[in-house]
Amino acid sequence: MLDQRLVRENPELMARELARRGLTVDLNSLQALAQQQRDLEEQRSSLQAEGNRVGKEVGLKIKAGADPKGSDVAELRQQGNAIKQKVAVLEDEERQLAAELKTQLLTFPNLPSPACPDGRDENDNIEVRSWGDPRRQEGLDEHWAIADRLGLLDSERSVRIAQSRFVTLFGQGARLERALINFMLDLHTGKGYREVLPPVLVNSASLTGSGQLPKFAEESFRCADDDLWLTPTAEVPLTSLHRDEIIPLDQLPLRYVAYSPCFRREAGSYGRDTRGLIRLHQFNKVELYWFVHPDHADEAHAAITADAEAVLQALELPYRVLELCTGDLGFSAARTYDLEVWLAGAGAYREISSCSVCGDFQARRSSIRTKDGKTTRLVHTLNGSGLAIGRTMAALLENGQQADGSVLLPQALVPYFGSDRLQPE
């Protein structure tokens, strides 16, 4: 959530930075709310000061020998009670205004970092670097065809069980999924991340804290009878691990890694990626999450991105790193690096990880702070996929396919999978 002080003190900056995202906003109503709230605060403070003065005067009169039940004291006490009632009314009005202001602020995305390149959409993203030698060869199959041939998954039975955009993995496919999850968790915990296995169901406060609500409610699955949602990413429960907490400064940075199933409606993706593992309603992902001191956010962003890249390098998968422009940033992100893995069958790069620094945006929504000397301040948060399992499997199938129909796997996976290749069953 954006800082309310921006609305009151620098609305021009807020409007200008949102315009970098391609958003034209009218802040007049927001400014009016913020000013009303400030006026009420000043009225309440003035009344409370007057109430304190009256209370002290009562004490002084009694100390000087006045009758506690006398008319002078009674009149002052009556005056004090009237002030308390007025203060209570103002506090109630303040709460209502604060709630309305917060409701409006929750709909605004994060402001882009000054370092984030300006641009309109994904066409303006900037390639930062690449790694590996992409396999460019005619006649290679896409991953869904390879998976069908090897008997790794069944989409038709999944439609019978659930609906479209679900898959059921069998045999080597299920084993490879499990191997990838364990490999990624071991790689990240070996670098000092603390492993977390969070709830798959999360409440509305958690989704609001990470930035999914209220904007993306229609893209998530909600339980009919409870205030619970299927999590779209482990970023949601990881953000709320420290909601409403003050993290001791000497504990920062906190680095977590979590495997979780993820659930998304994929609204607006009709007709795209209808086959295979690229765009599903349910998929598995290993997520990286950092809580850091604000002064260390930039170096943490480089580090979390490098940790996601390390998975691709260990799996010998060619990829490139793109810095997203302002027009392509996610809702909660201030700056993002996307990792795109090469799919040899499709002959294209596809996103497999987004590594974002969110500044204090999520921390303000979730009230996550640290104590810096005598000052309490919001922490900064970062997140990144490390990695999406299904898309990693798709890349392994397409890049490792062999002329005899088998799929050669990278050596790093052999201890987890038990073999260096997938064979037709």
From Swiss-Prot:
UniProt cross-references to InterPro entries, sorted A to Z: aa-tRNA-synt_IIb (IPR002314), aa-tRNA-synth_II (IPR006195), aa-tRNA-synth_II/BPL/LPL (IPR045864), Ser-tRNA-ligase_type_1 (IPR002317), Ser-tRNA-synth_1_N (IPR015866), SerRS_1_N_sf (IPR042103), SerRS_core (IPR033729), tRNA-bd_arm (IPR010978)
Coiled coil start-end: none
Keyword hit for Manganese: no
Binding site for ATP: R264, R265, E266, E351, I352, S353, S354
Major enzyme class: ligase
Catalytic activity, reaction form: tRNA(Ser) + L-serine + ATP = L-seryl-tRNA(Ser) + AMP + diphosphate + H(+); tRNA(Sec) + L-serine + ATP = L-seryl-tRNA(Sec) + AMP + diphosphate + H(+)
Keywords: Aminoacyl-tRNA synthetase, ATP-binding, Cytoplasm, Ligase, Nucleotide-binding, Protein biosynthesis
Compartment(s) of residence: Cytoplasm
Principal place of residence: cytoplasm
CC terms in the record's Gene Ontology section: cytoplasm
Pathway per the UniProt entry: Aminoacyl-tRNA biosynthesis; selenocysteinyl-tRNA(Sec) biosynthesis; L-seryl-tRNA(Sec) from L-serine and tRNA(Sec): step 1/1
GO molecular function: ATP binding; serine-tRNA ligase activity
Assembly and oligomerization: Homodimer. The tRNA molecule binds across the dimer.
UniProt-listed HAMAP family: Ser_tRNA_synth_type1 (MF_00176)
The family this protein is said to belong to: Belongs to the class-II aminoacyl-tRNA synthetase family. Type-1 seryl-tRNA synthetase subfamily.
Record note on domains: Consists of two distinct domains, a catalytic core and a N-terminal extension that is involved in tRNA binding.
Function (record text): Catalyzes the attachment of serine to tRNA(Ser). Is also able to aminoacylate tRNA(Sec) with serine, to form the misacylated tRNA L-seryl-tRNA(Sec), which will be further converted into selenocysteinyl-tRNA(Sec).
Name of the protein: Serine--tRNA ligase
Lineage: Bacteria, Bacillati, Cyanobacteriota, Cyanophyceae, Synechococcales
Record gene name: serS
